[in-house]
Amino acid sequence: GKVIGKEGRNVRAFERATGVDVLVDETPGYVVLSSFDPIRREIARVAMEALVKDGRIQPAKIEECVETARKEVSQTGRKMGEKACYDAGVPNLHPDLVAILGRLHFRTSYGQNVLWHSVEMANMAAIIAEEVGADVAVARAGALLHDIGKTVSHEVAGTHVEIGIRILQKYGVEEAVIL
């Protein structure tokens, strides 16, 4: 009842603020948040939980909770990017690139978290590079960043590979890592 609001105004305000569709089911206590964008979905989830916990669900409070959730999700992404760089042994990336990398934390592919897949790839690439005498640092960085284009592939034209190359070039990543 409170989530929907009078004549659906709360649901409409929430959908407008988050860009996520709200599906209210007959099952009590359940709301489905639907979006192809995993970051929007996470912002909506965090905001909805805060609204339900607070109990005061109204358009002004919705805006406030969504803005707080945006900041929280952004901060979580940045922290996850920093952790991934540490775990993968890839230091000294541009802070904005680390934040973009952290957005992969909210994405899955074939049921696996894309950020942790990238960390695993970086560590495997390092082992293989060591075995064959290749540059371990380049292999680590290339593997960690190989899916970076997936963070914005739904917002920008091109394949995630093409987008990733443009992102890495923008932040001055060396050509050996990009190729």
Predicted segments with their positions:
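Short glycine/threonine-rich beta-strand-turn micro-motifs
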Residues: G1-K2, E26-E42
